Amino acid sequence: MAVIAFNPPTGTAGIVVTRRKPGHFVVLTEDSRTDAVLAQGGVKLADALEKRAAISVHNAQQGPSDGSSLSPAAGVRSVDPYDVTIAMPAEDGEPVVSDADREAWGKWRVAYDVTIEAAPFKVTGILLLLPSQDPTSLTERGTELFLPVFAPTVLIDGVLLKDTPRDAILVNRSHIRRVNAGMR
């Protein structure tokens, strides 16, 4: 649940409470987009993906990765993390990185402006890495399968994907082909 303060009209309350659906997420693969809910409650999307095993899902819908309409996909019961290029929360889903984690990372990590090519996607945003990490080495095998990219924009074949969350998305390292980075 998120609590947001704002300037309310006269005679109304100043707090809006929005309910987030735990586990509601969207994944983009090279050829499709899947919108689903994690079947196991209480698990964060990033944690489920890092287990590197098929993730059980329900209420799945699929469509092209270009952002066009989705249709029910009754046959989709699981998502393989290795097939996922980009994972992100659905519009009403929980963020992939908590505010506390992001704040801690911001203090102890080096910020880079990055452009990541993971065909057919091009992701631009901010990457927070440990001082010992080199952003150009992200194409090599690492301990983490997914990397959070903050303040992301996603292009698919040169066209901006409109329903990208503003806070962060997860990019699969095994799909990264090229990284261009500069310190902030």
Could you describe each region identified by the protein language model?
Residues 2-184:
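Conserved RNA-binding domains used in RNP assembly and mRNA/RNA metabolism
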